[in-house]
């Protein structure tokens, strides 16, 4: 079970509206994150099917991971609706589901259970570092409620990473994955992390707010803002450390790999 409860632990009435209400980029970021997080039940179901050999993993996925991810979505949704109550969240979310659900199937899973655990580690690296950046951004805006909320989420994501790491190691005892295979999955997941779901979230907001066909150039502007945020607030060294951990490298190799991973992240726009 989640170690915090957004209904009790987040005081939405204490939000400093002046600091955030005019920030449309922040609105987009938090709304997109709420859409993706709140849809975690679909992933939990697919993952539980994939790991039906492992009742302990399934229990953790259903009783902890899924509940915590959905809580992230609910907590962010409430923040968005508190600050921007005129936004038809539900309507935009329904559009998001139309675009996003066809992508959520076990067909996109890795070929082995160990490699899929590894892919989940990369996803959790993405979320951990993203919420760490959001927390830092919220602090720079001097909005303590958002800083507190994103800190809670950040802690959960790091915890998810360590669970998936544990299961990755468990499966790797029998799968004996080589570094090349591991690196391939890392790079592949890094590519995916930077794209589709965020763009679909953006598209749904755009369509509902403008009542118009999606204009890709507005997404390019959003990405520019995202890059600006990353430059100031993204914890790159934490991301690199978490990304490289499954490679289990010695110190010399690790030093060699840092610029490779950093370079890959740059190319991918992370
Ligand atoms: Fe989450
Ligand atoms: Fe997570």
Locate the predicted segments by residue.
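Non-heme di-metal
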Residues: 1-270
